[in-house]
Amino acid sequence: MNRKIFGIITFGTFASVAVLCAAPVRAADAKTPYPSMAPLDQYLIADRNAEIALARTAAPLSISRDATVMVLGPHGYETAVAGKNDFVCMVERAWMNPFDSPEFWNPKNRSPICLNPPAARTVLPLTVMRTKLVLAGKSKEEVKESVKAAIEKKELPELEAGAMSYMMSKDAYLTDKGGHNMAHLMFYMPLGTVWGANVVDSSNEVSEPFPGSPLLLAPSYKGNPEPIDMFLMGTGVWSDGTAAPM
């Protein structure tokens, strides 16, 4: 695979700095646009029904209409709709990015996702824990160390075979870069799995050890601290069946 699949979320060109003496400050801001957590209300969606609807756009209706739906509250995720098919749909926030991502605290991030049953059982608990710690006011380093400790103590479930998720929402805002979005599937595998995937770093830059491969190895998890490799594959179609950029 080349950069075409991931090109929609690469950096755009920034305007030149008008005042020369301000350049160092602006450069620093560009590298760390979100240095700390924004006020909580910027991450919440006031209309609960709107968040439920957005969560369901992550997967085709045949999956999402019978899924459990979770929404973000002031203290963490809570179940808004009880499902029938053991899938779970929700809208993730930016703190599910790698800990060194410059967008870790981006309040604009809205990432609808539907997890299949194995992922709901063994990947979702990571999301729930990270979120609870963030909303309790923990720093990035404190969140990371708490998750690491929970893994070492086996307080979190081990990854189950067959875990995957859908991120096919046309209305997602995944990143500030490019088109902000990408319709894709995600496959969760044990750390160190080799699938011949090209590699995405925490700034969404792509290196290509396997040109032509349709797979990307995401920067999330990767032992930092979760012992999971997450592979992405573009779908070329949104959850509503319309064509998506590739």
Each language-model region and where it sits:
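Sec-dependent, cleavable N-terminal signal peptides
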Residues: S16-V17
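Bacterial N-terminal signal peptides that target proteins for export
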Residues: M1-T13
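Sec/Tat signal peptide C-region and signal peptidase I cleavage site
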Residues: C21-A27
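Primary mode marks residue(s) on the alpha4-beta5-alpha5 output face of response regulator receiver
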Residues: D29-M246
